[in-house]
Regions:
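Short aromatic/hydrophobic contact patches that present stacked aromatics
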Residues: 12-14, 46, 57, 65-67, ...
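Conserved acetyl-CoA-binding loop of GNAT-fold acetyltransferases
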Residues: 29-36, 84-86
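Vicinal oxygen chelate
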Residues: 19-20, 67-109
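N-terminal beta-strand motif that seeds the catalytic metal site of vicinal oxygen chelate
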Residues: 1-24, 53, 64-66, 116-133
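Hydrophobic pocket/interface hotspot
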Residues: 13, 23, 27, 76, ...
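Conserved beta-strand edge residues that scaffold enzyme active sites
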Residues: 41-42, 93-95, 121
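Conserved short beta-strand elements that form part of the metal-binding/catalytic scaffold
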Residues: 34-64, 109-115
Length: 133
């Protein structure tokens, strides 16, 4: 029986910043990355990478990276644990779906993210207004 790999793609690379405004001044204004969404309530903003749907996520609260897209964060966390890794932070709800933090047997942290609730919907100013899908 053929199975597909657990990690589907890099969904986002998170970059800790002291505050969103200074992070946006650098990554958006100085480096030219397009603002895709901004969620002040959770202290994050997503920026585009040309030719890719992987995002740069500026964050004031989270320091794990990269974020790996998986079909189910719950199933993926169990699979990593069965394979000899460990769960650092059990699966929990996030605005767009579910997220778990695991470590491989070598101590590398992996953020496992599913988009079971959809992606962010934004207004003309790129502020998050809800979810799509």
């Amino acid at each position: 029986m053929e199975t597909s790999p657990l990690l589907q793609k890099v969904d986002a690379v998170t970059i800790p910043v002291p505050d969103l405004e200074s992070g946006l001044r650098f990554y958006r204004d100085a480096l030219g990355h397009e603002l895709l969404w901004r969620h002040d309530g959770i202290g994050q903003a997503g920026l585009g990478l040309p030719g890719s749907d992987t995002e740069i996520v500026l964050t004031t609260r989270q320091d794990y990276e990269p974020n790996w897209l998986v079909a189910s964060a719950d199933d993926a966390a169990r699979a990593v644990e069965r394979a000899g890794g460990r769960v650092i932070s059990p699966p929990g709800d996030i605005p767009v779906g579910r997220l778990a933090v695991v470590a491989d047997p070598f101590g590398n942290a992996l953020v496992l993210l599913d988009l079971s609730r959809g992606r962010y919907a934004v207004d003309e100013e790129r502020q998050v207004t809800g979810l799509t899908g």
